[in-house]
Amino acid sequence: MTKHESKRNSGTDVSRREFLRLAAMGAMAGAAAALPEGVARAAEERPGSAYASHLRGVAEATDCKIEIEPPKEKIRYDILDAHLHFVDFLEQSDGFPALCAAMDLAGVSKAVIFGMGIAKQWDGSMDEPPTYYLSNDSRCYYYSATDFLVAEELLAQPTEIRERFYPFCCGFNANDRFAADHVEQVLRLYPKFWNGIGEIMSRHDDLTALTYGEPPHIDGPGFLGIFDLAAAKGLPVLVHHNVTAQNTERVLYLEELKRALAYNRNCNIIWAHIGISRRVEIKGLTKIADELLRGNKNLWVDISWLVYDYYFLDQFPNNYFDGDSLDDWAALIERHPDRFMIGTDKVGHWKTYPAEAVKYYTLLDKLRPATVDLICRENALSLIKQY
């Protein structure tokens, strides 16, 4: 800035930096006025936190026009996305305004949103940064700031964006017996804000193998403390727990899930992806899911990520066949219509978001209209904490 420009800006004109600061304060006050009392107080106590950067982010999202591919299907269903990460494994995101644009294109009116509780490390020996947890063999680590990124960014949004999301907290190590204490602190910092807990990682093949510390398992004492807290607070818990290891058809980890479900029947657990991940290939998954749902009234499942492409549509990359067809899955859902939900499992970037949402139309077209309403919206709404 030249001396002349500095002198000019010191007069009646307002500099761009000062304008952003003042605009952020005004946005904060307006946003806080529409929030529940506890959350409004939390917002008011954070002058200049994420609000100024949010205003810049909105402008950037508009100016650079983040590419979002429109769906190839005509929108026919109103969906609540039950599984959506606001950030990727580098804790980066295209932001809420672009996400809402993608949701609008896909016919998704609301979403359960959470961060990424595990971050990918960029090792000093690597010239190129990773872009995904499988980019290289660098380690991953638990990242507690992810909850604050989600909370601050969401609180910074105008009401019409904020009211579309149900935030879950996930930034803790569930192996730690202090995990429930950490979650309680986050709940206290953002009162009447969090609608659930998750996605928590347990038995996530390469991801948990790359993460510092012992491999997490859903029936460990840290998890059990989370379940007790969730039951007391009325919060559902979303857990990724593989049904078995990679490259074996033996079901190795099912008993851990059963013990977790039996531990506290007042804790409602959502089983992410029906226990499936990359290279997890088993026979009879519909039978396993059916038996679990019959025996555990506190279990729900989300259909998201690879389980739909591989197991519902038989699109395994190696032509593996698990023995079940799309009709078998539709029949299972009709037997338990109040226990399923669908999600995109997108991670921070929204270019292909519409395609991930409308891909479920092939399944939805096979279901009764009442069942469609349940798995597209009502089941998730019945679970999440309402204030």
Predicted regions and their residues:
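Active-site gating/metal-coordination segments in enzymes
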Residues: 48-60, 65-76, 125-245
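Acidic-and-aromatic substrate-binding clefts and catalytic sites of carbohydrate-active enzymes
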Residues: 87-95, 119-122, 140-146, 172-180, ...
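Signal peptide processing junction and immediate N-terminal pro/mature segment
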Residues: 35-45
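Alpha-helical scaffolding within the catalytic cores
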Residues: 64-67, 96-99, 148-153, 179-184, ...
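Mid-to-C-terminal alpha-helical segments outside catalytic/metal-binding sites
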Residues: 2-4, 15, 19-30, 45-82, ...
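Catalytic pocket-lining loop regions of alpha/beta-barrel enzymes
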Residues: 45-49, 55-58, 158, 204, ...
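N-terminal carbohydrate-binding/catalytic regions of secreted carbohydrate-active enzymes
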Residues: 88-129
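Hydrophobic faces of well-ordered beta-strands that scaffold small-molecule active sites
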Residues: 80-84, 111-113, 167-169, 197-198, ...
